[in-house]
Amino acid sequence: VAQFAVDTEEEGIALIRGLLSYMPQNNMEPAPKTICTDDIARKEDVLNEIIPDNPNKPYDMYEVIRGIVDNGEYLESAASYAKNIITCFARFNGQSVGIIANQPNFMAGVLDINASRKAARFVRFCDAFNIPIVTLVDVPGFLPGTGQEYGGVITHGAKLLFAYCEATVPKVTV
C-alpha cells in the first residue's frame, strides 16, 4: 500500500518537501518546530457547530482537523486506504505532530482490520521519529461480522493498542 500518490513529478517533489518539513533529520533528534504564523487569537466558530446533536448523524473529521491545526494545513498519509481513519502530519504552535482520527463520515468511523493496521503503522512511524501523537476519537467500536472475525480484527485491534502502549512520544487524546 502506497502512503502517497501524485500525478506529476512536480507534485511528488512538493509532497516530499512537505513531508520532510514535519520530520527530524534522523531518529535521534526531536521533531522539528517552526515559527508559527497562525493567529494566536484565531477563533473557529465552525468547531462549535460541527458535531451534530443527533449522535447517529455523521460529520466530517477533516473540518475538525483544519479547524485546530496551524493555518488549517496538514499532510495526510495513506489517504485512499482505510478511509474510516485519518492519519496525517500537522503542526500545533509550530510543533510537528502526527494526528490519528476516526472519520465518522466513512463507515461511521468504526475500527476494522485495515483501519487498525493503518493507525498502528502510523503510531509506530511517529514514535520512531519522535513525533508527538494527537488522537481525535469518535469511534463506535470495532466492525462486526464474520469476515472481520475470520480476518483477525481482534488481533489487529490489539496491535493498534500495543503500538500506542509501546510509543514513548507524548500522546494526547481528545
Where are these regions (language model features)?
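Ligand-binding clefts of soluble mixed alpha/beta catalytic domains
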Residues: 1-174
